[in-house]
Amino acid sequence: MDIEAKQILSAGLASLNITASQEYCDTLIAYAELIEAGNHYHSFVAASGRDLVVKHILDSLAPVNIFTNLIAANRYNTIGDFGTGAGLPGIPLALTFPDIHFTLIDRMTKRIQFLESVIAKLSINNVTVLETQAEHCKMQFDIVTFRAFHPFEYKLFKKLFKLCTPNGVIAAYKGKQDRVHSEIIEI
C-alpha cells in the first residue's frame, strides 16, 4: 500500500475522532493489503490503494461513534456481520472494538476461507466466522450489521430482526441518502 493511502487512512481516522495507535493503523493497512491480494481471486471490491481505504475501510468505520454509544448504553457485547464478503465492516470494527465479539457470516466457502486466513495472519482474537445464510443462522446478536448486500425490504428486516437479541438493533450500511429514504418508504 502506498504512502498516500496510509496518510489518507490517518487523516480519515482523525476526522472520525478515532484515536489510532501505530499498531492499529498498521493492522488496518495490512488488512487492506490482504483484500487487494485476495481481489485477484475473489473479486471482493472494485478498489485498491487510496480508494480501498476511503470507500471500504473508512466507510466501515464511519459510524464508529454510533456503535460506541450503542455498546456503552446497552452493554452490548456481540455483533453479527451478515454478507460480510471480505470482512467489511466487521474486521475494521473488530479492530476498533477489541472487547466486543464479532461473528462474520457469509454463505460462500471461498470468502469464509479468506476470512479465516485474514484472522490468523492479523492475530484477531475477537472474531469468528460462520458459513451460512441469514435465514439458517441459529445465533442472536446485540447488533446485526450488513453493508449494502440487499435493498431495504420488509422480508430482509424480518429475517435480520430474528437474529437480534431482545434489545438488539440493526445497523445497516447504505450508500446515498436519497436511495435509503426511497427504500425505507417501501417498507
Task: Describe these PLM feature segments.
Residues 1-74, 80, 110-111, 117-125:
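Class I SAM-dependent transferase core
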Residues 86-99:
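Conserved SAM-binding loop of SAM-dependent methyltransferases across substrates and taxa
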Residues 99-187:
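S-adenosylmethionine
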